């Protein structure tokens, strides 16, 4: 019995997901399988490729022939190089960065909220700002005048 390692398609029309399966070569694409040895999700970034290396090595060892797409996946994971005894058995599989948990994001947003805004949220109108600046300057001038008068009175006594 000729055995092939091939992809079994799952998912919707434009979002394919595949199972890496071992099946009789004569069965149809989504037909009965002997064993499911992995998954492949090409729409993720980077693509998700999870293949049970031990089972893949076993099936390759007993003569199962991988199809071309599965052969490419086995080369990426390094299982084909390990089977053939070639260098580069660690593979070239890219690993996605772990997403920050929602709890971490919430705690970070809470810490930023407690610190308060670094700049004012609203800007005052120019006319109002000029009036306040003039009033502030007048108050400073009065304070300076009072400060000058107070030492003069003390010196006179």
UniProtKB/Swiss-Prot annotation:
- Could you tell me which residues belong to the region Disordered? 114-157
Q: Name one Pfam family in it.
A: Ribosomal_S16
Keyword Ribosomal protein, does the record have it?
A: yes
Q: Does the keyword Ribonucleoprotein apply?
A: yes
SUPFAM superfamilies linked to this entry: Ribosomal protein S16
GO MF terms listed in the record are: structural constituent of ribosome
**Which biological process, per GO, is one annotated for this protein?**
translation
Assigned keywords, A-Z: Ribonucleoprotein, Ribosomal protein
Q: State the GO CC annotations.
A: cytoplasm; small ribosomal subunit
Provide the transmembrane region boundaries.
none
For this protein, the record's HAMAP family field holds: Ribosomal_bS16
Assigned protein family: Belongs to the bacterial ribosomal protein bS16 family.
Protein name (Swiss-Prot/TrEMBL): Small ribosomal subunit protein bS16
Q: Which gene encodes it?
A: rpsP
